Structures are given as structure tokens and as C-alpha cells.
Amino acid sequence: MKPPHADAETSFPPLFPSPPPSPSPLPPPFPPPFPLYEEEFAADPHSAYARMRADHGPLVPVELAPGVPATLVIGYAEALHILRDEYRFPADPRVWQRTVPDSCPVKPMMEWRPNAIRSQGAEHTRYRAANTAAIDAVDEHKLHDLVERISHRAIAGFRPAGQADLLVDFAWPLTFQVLSDLLGCPDSIGHRIADGMNKLFDGGEIAIRGNVILNQAVADLVAVKRNRPGYDITSRLIAHSARLDDTEMSHQIVTLYGAGIEPVVNLITNTLVRLLTDVEFSGDVHAGDASVREALDFVLYRDPPLANFCFAYPPHPVNLGGYLLPAHQPVVISMAGCNNDPALGDPQNASGNRAHLAWSAGPHACPARSQAYLIAESAITYLLDALPEMELACAPQDLTWRPGPFHRAIAHLPVVFPRVDQ
């Protein structure tokens, strides 16, 4: 078809040329990697997981630190697939870490160590067997009594004041002392180990210094226990048929402290946050209609103490459900994101549900979950019995959370209660 003026004898160009045709609309920009290290993420991670899911689905591009890309897994089914497949998703980070400068703030937390968490195959079996044997020999009746004794001492120290920070005054010193006793660690060495672990979990530049402190302290502990063995986890590791050398021993201790201090402290405090802010549930616990164990399971499901932690490094690009995972780039399981996958139902109704990933799954599942449960449950039960009128000393919205890509950790937990002179 001709344009209307095509047959005219004379045609003049328009006074103003027509604009060129509009280009086809560009596709919306792909959302940038989500930074897990910022305070905004720590303040409201569940909203962040919801945005990630809406933008990306179950596999999300993230940054663990500025310029450190990774894939965060927030789909429950996808996480189980990865955790159970050691061949396509090994835990050994050595190829990746060669591409990361020593100044990288998350490198100390993620780098290779000769332990069960960062190994596979025969070496993983060897390390895990030694650790499992040493942990399984813990007498849980004696452990319960130990937790109660240390709880009593901690509460006696702050009870006359009528106020306390349950993180600084209760959960942290209790967990530290219990673990040090189980490992046969002298206080002078244990305090250095705890300082190093705290710095390591916080990430940032301070993590590098924390790694140095930690490595020297655990080396000193191994030397002490080789010379003076006792009935403790460290001595049992030394005596195990795996015949761990000093370097391997040091890394087993680092692993045990890493899995024993920060996660258990966070489990205790996160559970206390729920009991102090959920009046109805707290009332049920005090009345005996709900148990501390149910509160622990709710927190492990909703706000696990290590929110994003299990790492895998595919040796080749992997297509998982239509998502291409790059070779030798971290794949991080978000226990918090996976537990709150809408495919599992409403997480608010998760009380008593133990199908969560807080303890991981597959060959790298936590070997000390029974002991961790016992420590947290015994400590919280003793505290609630000792201070039944305890209340939060601030508005719930004023509680703040420590930033960091790996943990779900309260910064402070202030409470008040009637003063009682000793």
C-alpha cells in the first residue's frame, strides 16, 4: 500500500523531520548480586530472602564480601540435592582460594583446612571418624550437670544487679566454659581461642587477625594435651587410630570451637529472644504447655544460628534445575533461606518440626547436634527457672543484629528482673 502522498505531483519534505522509530524496549536489568555483608541484611534477613526468591528463584547471585561472588541456595530441595552430592559439589575450596587475595575478609572463614568440613572421600572419612568418636564419648548426664553448675555461677554473678546482658553475661561465658571443659582447655588458652573465633565470624579485616590468634592458641592447646592427656575430647582425638599430626589436630580443634561457641551462643540467645518477645509462647513454656525444646526447634527452623554456612565448590560448571553454577565458585547453603522456603509451608507453624537444615544434611551433617541441643536446653531451662520474672529491657524493635554473611547473631540482649541479694 502506498502512502497517501505518493501520487502527488509535488511533495515537500516536512518542516520538522519525523523522529526515528523507537528502539525495541530493553529487557529489565538483571538484579545485581545481593550483598550479604551489609547491616541492612542483618537487620531483616527474611525480607531479603523474600526479595531474592522473587528476583532469582532458589539460586541467588550474592556477594559474601565486596568483590567475592557466590551462589546462595535458598531452595530446600536444591539444598538437599547439593548437600548429598559430594561428587558434583565437593567441599574443598583450594582452587577457589588461589583466586582470592589474603586480604579477603571472608577467606579465613572459608579457606581449606585439613578437617572433615573442608575435605571429601577418604580424608573426610578419616577426620569425621576421629571427631565422631571423641564427641560420642561425652557423658551427657555429666554434661547436663556441668551446664547447670556453670549456669548457676553465671546467674549468681549478675542477679544482685537486677539487670544483665544475656549475651555477654550468660550465653557466651557459659558456652565458652562448657566447651573448654569438654576439650580439656586451660582458661588462659581458651580465652585466646574465643577471641580469635569471635573475630573470625565477624568477618571484615578483623577476621584476618582473628585467624592468627586462633591458630596459635589451638597449637598451644595441642602441645599441652600431648604432654598431659586427660579424659577430654582433645586427648581422645590425639589417641584415635587416625593418628592425627599436630597440624591436623590444630584444625580439628578449630573446627570444634567454631561449631561449639558461636552457633551454640546464637542458638541460646535467639531462643531467648523469642521467649522474651513472644508473650503467648513464653507463657505456654512457663505453664508447661510448651517446652524449651520446642522453642529451640522453632529457632533452628526460623532463625538458625548459622544462617548461611555450608560451602561447596563445583569442579565443573553444573546445570541445576536450569541454573548454571560456575566452576570453582562458592555455592553457599542458606539454612535460614531454605528452612523458610514457601514450598515447606508457613515457618510460623514450625514449632516442633525438626526437618530443618540448621544441622546441615548428608555426609557433612553436624556430628554434635545432641550435645548442642543439651547445652542450649539445659542452660535456658535453668535460666527461666532462676529468673521467672525476667523481661526484655528494651523494645523488641530496638534489638540489633551483628552484620556478617554467615551468622544470625544478636548484638546485645538486655533484660531486667527483680534484684535478689546473694
Name what the model sees in each region.
Residues 75, 260, 328, 376:
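Short, conserved phosphate/pyrophosphate- and ester-handling motifs at nucleotide-, phospho-/glycolipid
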Residues 308, 321-322, 327-343:
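A translation/RNA-centric and nucleic-acid-associated enzymatic feature enriched
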Residues 181-188, 271-285, 338-344, 389, ...:
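Cytochrome P450
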Residues 183, 192-247:
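Cytochrome P450 catalytic core segment centered on helix I
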Residues 250-255, 261-286, 370-387:
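Cytochrome P450 catalytic-core helices
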Residues 2-19, 23-167, 176-194, 198-200, ...:
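Active-site substrate-recognition loop segments, prototypically the cytochrome P450 B′-helix/B-C loop
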Residues 346-413, 422:
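Cytochrome P450 heme-thiolate "Cys pocket" and heme-binding signature region
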Residues 286-323:
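Conserved cytochrome P450 K-helix E-x-x-R motif and the immediately C-terminal K′/meander segment
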